[in-house]
Amino acid sequence: MILKIKIKEISMLLCLLFYCSISSANEIFLSLKKSKVNVRYGPSFDSDVKYVYKKINLPIKQIDKKENFRRIIDLKNNSGWIHVSQLIRSNSVIATNDKILFKKPTSFAIPIALIKKGRLLIVQKCEKNWCEIKTDYFNGWIKTDDLWGLTN
């Protein structure tokens, strides 16, 4: 009897570990499609507006979904529900620390600019641990560490 209980407990633990590893590997980042996006308390147009984002391309993380709404969380841990028509696949990130933008994807390349913490960046493409990005004024390469919104 004790052996059956232990086997059952172990198998439940393995299932839980397997599920957690799958869910963390499948993080979904999206970006805001419009310059004004309502975030609601619930997954319905009948739900009250909790707050309004006013930043196009802002990256957000999807943590749940229900029909045509996605529950999201942002870099500052604000959360709520957004309709799918206001979201696009993520092509943007936010620098979580000051970073150097390089001309080529190597630390030995010519530095182009200092990217300040909190800066919104548009990702062109990624190779290994580097992403080619553009800002309002610069194009170049940046290391992928300390970027929020990047899918692995």
What is the role of each PLM region?
Residues 44-47:
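Second-shell loop/turn segments in exported
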